Amino acid sequence: MPRGMMQRDSRKVSEEMKPTENPRVKICCIQSVEEAWMAIEHGAAAVGLVSAMPSGPGPIPEDLIAEIAAKVPPGVSSFLLTCLQDADAIVDQQRRLRVNTIQICDRLPAGSYQQLREALPGVSLVQVIHVTGPESVDEAIAIAAEVDAILLDSGNQSLAIKELGGTGRTHDWRLSRAIREAIDVPLFLAGGLKPENVAEAIREVRPFGVDVCSGLRIEGLLDPQKLAAFFRATDETQTNTD
C-alpha cells in the first residue's frame, strides 16, 4: 500500500476507495524485524507496530518500533498504533519513531486532527472505531471527513481498563458494512479475523483492507502456516465476492 494512497489532500471518491475483491492485508502486532519481513514476503501491504496500550497483546518498546519502521521497504505502510489522546504527544511520538501512518486507537478531542495534519504533513491518519452498536455508524460518519481511513475493531472504550484492540473478538459485520457504505474513505476491517473466517468477512463487508493480529499467532509468535493460510483465504475472495 503506497504511502500516499490514503493521504487526504489527494483523496477522492474513487475506485480505489470502493468495495474491493482484493483487499489489502495489514499484519498487526509485529514483534521483530524478522516478523515484519515474513509478513511482507507473504504479501502484506502494511505492518502494525503497537506502542504502549492499557490492555491487549502486541506492545513493543519504542526503540524496536523505530528499528522495524526504518527497515520497512517503500510501498509498504508502517502503522503506529497509539493510545495517546493529546495531539502534541502523538506528534512527538511519530517524530521519534518515523512511521508513515498513525493508527489512532482512542477518541481524540475536537481540533486534534487539524493539529496533526499541520504538524505531520504526508503522514496518513487512520482512526479506529470500536464497533459496539448502531451508534458506531454515526461515530464513523462524523470522523471520516477528518482522516485518511477508518479501521473497525472490537474493543471497548467504556471499560475501567480500556480495550483498544487485540481482543480476538469479531463484531457485527452488518454494522461494518453499513459503515463502509456510508463513508467515502477506505475502510479496514479488524477484530477476530483468522484464516477460517476472513473470506466470509470480506464477502460480508467488502472492505478496502483487512487487519489481523492474534488470529495468526501461536504463543505470541507469528506462525508462517497460519499466515500463508490467511493469504490463501483472502485470495479466494477475488472470484467469489458478491
Give the role of each language-model region:
Residues 2-209, 214-239:
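Conserved N-terminal beta1-alpha1 strand-loop-helix module at the mouth
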